[in-house]
């Protein structure tokens, strides 16, 4: 499969702020089916200074148009993607009833994850913890959307339009680019990167919630 990391996304996209676990959150990780209003619980994340070169690179990563349909090198790789899409759609059905909305969401998660060099199961687990898959979730400190992007990211590397963070692809683009940024800062240490994302760097609670939720979205293709 060919995937251009610089490929366009949504022009309104901006980098993502770190997350706050949703109140219904990760209790869904451990099997509790809480369903609360569009409020998410924030971690004590801090806005960090960015070097000009880093800010420029992050801004370039988010400033694209809608993602193209993926192009696969082989029929088998395309079939593998479609099998993944079908399985994830089945798992997500209880949370997102509308088929078209569900498939569009999963296609975008897959694209943005791969574009940022992340595993889709990790991103889905993070979304489960951050917002419980609620598009309009808002934390007590103002983090927004599926991946609980902090508004300051729109100012730092986007066009400043914080309402755009409720746009599905914009939010997912920001979230994936920001998590990738934290992974790079932490030299690939996912535990520490997740802590940065939540504003609780070095503490185990949030990373462990995401690791637990990720298991709900792990996918093993069927044996040939």
Question: At which residue positions do the language-model features occur?
Answer:
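Sec/Tat signal peptide C-region and signal peptidase I cleavage site
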Residues: 36-42
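N-terminal secretory signal peptides and thylakoid transit peptides that target proteins
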Residues: 10-31
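Cleaved targeting-peptide boundary
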Residues: 42-51
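N-terminal Lys/Arg-rich, disordered targeting/topogenic segments
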Residues: 1-10
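Catalytic glycan-binding domains that act on GlcNAc-containing polysaccharides
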Residues: 44, 64-224
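Conserved catalytic or metal-liganding residues and their short signature motifs at active sites
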Residues: 59-63
